[in-house]
A protein has these predicted regions:
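Conserved GNAT-fold acetyl-CoA-binding loop/helix
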Residues: 17-43
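Conserved beta-strand-loop-alpha-helix junction that forms the acyl-donor binding cleft
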Residues: 90, 116-126
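Conserved acetyl-CoA-binding loop-helix of GNAT-fold acetyltransferases
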Residues: 91-106, 128-132
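Short hydrophobic/aromatic beta-strand or adjacent loop that forms the aromatic wall/cage
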Residues: 50, 153-157
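A short beta-loop-alpha structural element at the N-terminal edge
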Residues: 3-16
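Conserved catalytic-core motifs of GNAT/GCN5-like acyltransferases
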Residues: 115-119, 131, 136-151
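Acetyl-CoA-dependent GNAT
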Residues: 33-88, 99-100, 161-162
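Conserved GNAT acetyl-CoA-binding A-motif
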Residues: 106-118
């Protein structure tokens, strides 16, 4: 089993589209509309200024991470980042590898900190890996996430200096 992370371009988004579509359609972790189409998804993931990376397991894209300045100008030294891992390969440590890569890459790109703007309170796996990697909850957004389009749950803002 070989796992490799490479920088990606928007024209390769189709490689991770099935992963994105499955995660977003579940309505449990990302705020994108559950019926997001391919072109909308590409625009979200490859937002202006974003650097995007795909994780390949034995040559197949199974994960992705973006890193983007959280705000422009005087706050551009803080980045925002997100990651998606294919459900079929979860539990193999790939999320940890994507986290380690993201922390190192954000620092290499010159960012001083990472702010995660919306971590859903019901996303235990994400919260656990973030806490294990030095992120702290710095704010709670009551009822900020419409979980599965059925009920409102809290979301957190997480922060970590690099």
């Amino acid at each position: 089993m070989s796992f490799e992370i490479k920088e990606a371009t928007a024209d390769r988004f189709e490689e991770i589209w099935p992963i994105f579509r499955e995660i977003v359609r579940a309505g449990e972790t990302y705020p994108y509309p559950m019926n997001t189409n391919l072109e909308e998804a590409r625009a979200f993931w490859f937002a202006p200024g974003a650097r995007v990376y795909f994780g390949y397991l034995d040559g197949v894209a199974v994960a992705s991470r973006y890193i983007v300045p959280n705000k422009p100008g005087l706050a551009s030294h803080v980045c925002n980042t997100g990651v998606m891992v294919d459900a079929t390969v979860r539990g193999q440590g790939l999320g940890k590898k994507m986290m380690d890569f993201g922390l190192a890459k954000a620092k290499e790109l010159g960012f001083k900190a990472i702010q995660l703007n919306l971590v859903v309170s019901t996303n235990g796996a994400s919260l656990e890996i973030c806490k294990r990697n030095g992120f702290q909850i710095v704010g709670t957004l009551p009822g900020a996430f419409h979980f599965r389009g059925e009920r409102y749950v809290d979301a957190y803002i997480l922060y970590r200096a690099l």
